Amino acid sequence: MRTTYMAKPNEVERKWYVVDAAGKTLGRLASEVAALLRGKHKPTFTPHVDCGDHVIVINADKVELTGKKLTKKLYYRHSLYPGGLKVRTALEMRTNYPEQMIERAVRGMLPKGSLGRQMFKKLHVYRGSEHPHQAQKPEVYELRG
């Protein structure tokens, strides 16, 4: 009888990928990055083990949004005090906090739980084209979309 292969946490080999967000649509970029972080691109993917790779996203400030989302899409956060709801448009987020915009989109596509939080720690987002991870020798990953 054959048994299904289950990856073990200490057997997982992690690679580093660089993804250029310049000119890419936010949601399409986030879904592919989330798949890389989960390890869905590997034949050894196991749902209950973090077998994903590290992903470096550069040029976060050049990510695109379709339609009127730059002015219409709103990002909410709350200070947990009465009347503490803060609202920012996507345009404000892209100009002032582009890293948070991509991180929020990717986090929403990862599992909700301790495994998802562990996967999210392997995401590294940078505003410009420079990043401090040259020592890891990251491969350039071309997005499909």
UniProtKB/Swiss-Prot annotation:
Molecular-function annotations in GO: mRNA binding; structural constituent of ribosome
Alphabetical list of CDD domains matching this protein: Ribosomal_L13
Gene3D superfamilies reported for this sequence: Ribosomal protein L13
Entries under Pfam families matching the protein: Ribosomal_L13 (PF00572)
SUPFAM superfamilies named among the record's database cross-references: Ribosomal protein L13 (SSF52161)
One GO-annotated biological process of the protein: translation
GO cellular component terms, A-Z: cytosolic large ribosomal subunit
Database matches in InterPro entries: Ribosomal_uL13, Ribosomal_uL13_bac-type, Ribosomal_uL13_CS, Ribosomal_uL13_sf
Keywords from the UniProt entry: Ribonucleoprotein, Ribosomal protein
Family: Belongs to the universal ribosomal protein uL13 family.
PANTHER family: LARGE RIBOSOMAL SUBUNIT PROTEIN UL13M, RIBOSOMAL PROTEIN L13
Function: This protein is one of the early assembly proteins of the 50S ribosomal subunit, although it is not seen to bind rRNA by itself. It is important during the early stages of 50S assembly.
Subunit structure: Part of the 50S ribosomal subunit.
Protein known as: Large ribosomal subunit protein uL13
Taxonomic source organism: Geobacillus kaustophilus (strain HTA426)
